[in-house]
């Protein structure tokens, strides 16, 4: 059975939660062994897949979880706004570390390596390709190039201002167009994740609301300060 078919079965049985275990950079939690522990806890709680950034974190996580891992490498480039898995060597390193799915930036922006080249390299390793997109045009273009999974990950992050709510409209438009959609980006409550599934998402990735303790504490602190001021 193919990995996509296996995921279809798991999603039907468990609801389609993917947990992104990406601690705040330089956080006390930003250690491979802690990332792996969070991923294992998420798997034991019913996550159908895990999203991991960085080769060392992926290697540590692969050693302890059996669910599929979506691997990415983030870089800050001087000559491109693209941050997610921008280079061939990133794809190769993630494949060697044990990723099942490799996600790349799928937006229409200047980049060091074309999307189609990265997708071909992912498929060369026999892995599934996911593209992190920001618009319907991004997603449909990536689907035509052969990406098996389209993520709404970058919606709201390629524009001057980022909305507070997730982009359910993008989820629906891509789903209606026949894409296998992972809803991602600002899904901070179970209700929002459920809404994404109702709008046609194949699965939903949740990160900050589960694995970024600093963000969660900030949300509580902000709300509580407003209540007493």
UniProtKB/Swiss-Prot annotation:
InterPro entries referenced in this protein's UniProt entry, alphabetically: Aldolase_TIM (IPR013785), NanE (IPR007260), RibuloseP-bd_barrel (IPR011060)
Reactions the enzyme catalyzes: an N-acyl-D-glucosamine 6-phosphate = an N-acyl-D-mannosamine 6-phosphate
One Pfam family from the record: NanE
GO molecular function annotations of the record: N-acylglucosamine-6-phosphate 2-epimerase activity
Cited Gene3D superfamilies: Aldolase class I (3.20.20.70)
Function in brief: Converts N-acetylmannosamine-6-phosphate (ManNAc-6-P) to N-acetylglucosamine-6-phosphate (GlcNAc-6-P).
Name of the featured protein: Putative N-acetylmannosamine-6-phosphate 2-epimerase
The organism of origin for this protein: Escherichia coli O157:H7
Gene expressing this chain: nanE
């Amino acid at each position: 059975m193919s990995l996509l078919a296996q995921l279809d079965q798991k999603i039907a049985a468990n609801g389609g939660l993917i947990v992104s275990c990406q601690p705040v950079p330089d956080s006390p939690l930003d250690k491979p062994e802690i990332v792996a522990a969070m991923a294992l806890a998420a798997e034991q709680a019913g996550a159908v897949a895990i999203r991991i950034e960085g080769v060392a974190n992926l290697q540590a996580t692969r050693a302890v979880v059996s669910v599929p891992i979506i691997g990415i490498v983030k870089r800050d480039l001087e000559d491109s706004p693209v941050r997610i898995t921008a280079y061939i060597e990133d794809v190769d390193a993630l494949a060697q570390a044990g990723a099942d799915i490799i996600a790349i930036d799928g937006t229409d922006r200047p980049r060091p390596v074309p999307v189609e080249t990265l997708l071909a390299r992912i498929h060369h390793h026999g892995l599934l390709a996911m593209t992190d997109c920001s618009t319907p045009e991004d997603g449909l273009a990536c689907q035509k190039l052969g990406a098996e999974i389209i993520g709404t990950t970058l919606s709201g992050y390629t524009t001057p201002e980022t909305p507070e709510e997730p982009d359910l409209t993008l989820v629906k438009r891509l789903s209606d167009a026949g894409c296998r959609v992972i809803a991602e980006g600002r899904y901070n409550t179970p209700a929002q994740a459920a809404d994404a599934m109702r709008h046609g998402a194949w699965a939903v990735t949740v990160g900050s609301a589960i694995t970024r303790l600093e963000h969660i504490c900030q949300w509580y602190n902000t709300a509580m300060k407003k209540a007493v001021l």
